[in-house]
Amino acid sequence: MKFPSPFTPNSIKIMLLGSGELGKEVIIEAQRLGLETIAVDKYENAPAHGVAHRSYVVNMQDKEALLDLIQKENPTYILPEVEAISLEALLEAEEKGFCVIPSAKAVSLTMNRKGIRTFAAEEVGVKTSQYRFVKTLDELRSAAEEIGYPCVIKPVMSSSGHGQSVCRMAEEIEACFEEAKEARGDSSELIVEEFIPFDYEITLLTLNNGKKITFCDPIGHIQKGGDYIFSWQPAQMKKSVLKKAQKIARDVVSALGGRGIFGVELFIKKNEVYFSEVSPRPHDTGMVTLITQNFSEFALHLRAVLGAPLHVERISAGASAAFKSSQESQTPSVTLPKEAYAKDCDFRVFGKPVSHEGRRMAVLLIKDEEAESALKRAKKLIKKVSE
């Protein structure tokens, strides 16, 4: 495989749409391969802006503005890293011959929960929780009665768990409706899901390089308010259950098509596996691979995009812990304790230009002989990180 130098006529250009902490790692890996890198986001000084060859501040939901930038830069690959992007722009760019990763169709289906849930359950035929789509409070009441309490209520379009809640009784319906309505983005619809009292949940990082599908070891994770706070690898599970999980992930990723990494989220209840969601990009819970694998999810993503051979090997057990800000600040900082500099620890400080309550500002990484002990240490150490 040939890697022309950046700024030469035949350079391989990647345009990243969304330049947060995950995108920053993708750009760093692209730089290691000598690719020409362009980072785009809606705000200045986004994390990936500082490591890309060029950066732009653009409203990515503005179809014409985004198309103009794509035409100007003429990227080899367009990598959407967030959901707040004009789908029309991506579809039109693909029609004009640009390569959207993994494809405009896959981005379209996974951009909202209605698209991917309908696709997975009704077209691919994988097992999911019961679900209904609603628009009004009355429709929500009817759907909740039909599915039963408790149930999970989410906007069809939102990210990082925004607007998601568990409704445990009819008296809570209106408050849950208002919470979801506030966060529902470009869609007027909500999804009501059966609450699965799962034993645990995993992310199965699934890679497609156009020739074969490859899996990373399963990643366990804990979420709070729909957003990840801890992850660990490997998640302990029976081989028979892992095979079921891999089959679901393979079926969904094969049906979506395209190259790259897919973060497939699954619920496990006893020996049953339920499909939850899929992201066609590196996954936040996968940051643990920065310390557990020979190649991180970010390096593997790029290799898959390029159609290169993939060699996935876990070299250690480990855990990650997200550090979130508790305050609004125009001059944010992260203070790490001396224990974070131990030989089996690592960290990433994202360098975001401003902080606000709940914004992820850093991640702590720990490796150990067992994932359980790494997680225990991560939970203890993250409490010593401050602003």
Curated annotation (Swiss-Prot):
One of its GO terms (cellular component) is cytosol. It holds the Pfam family ATP-grasp. The keyword Metal-binding applies. GO terms for biological process: 'de novo' IMP biosynthetic process. GO terms for molecular function: ATP binding; magnesium ion binding; phosphoribosylglycinamide formyltransferase 2 activity; phosphoribosylglycinamide formyltransferase activity. Involved in the de novo purine biosynthesis. Catalyzes the transfer of formate to 5-phospho-ribosyl-glycinamide (GAR), producing 5-phospho-ribosyl-N-formylglycinamide (FGAR). Formate is provided by PurU via hydrolysis of 10-formyl-tetrahydrofolate. Belongs to the PurK/PurT family. This is Formate-dependent phosphoribosylglycinamide formyltransferase.
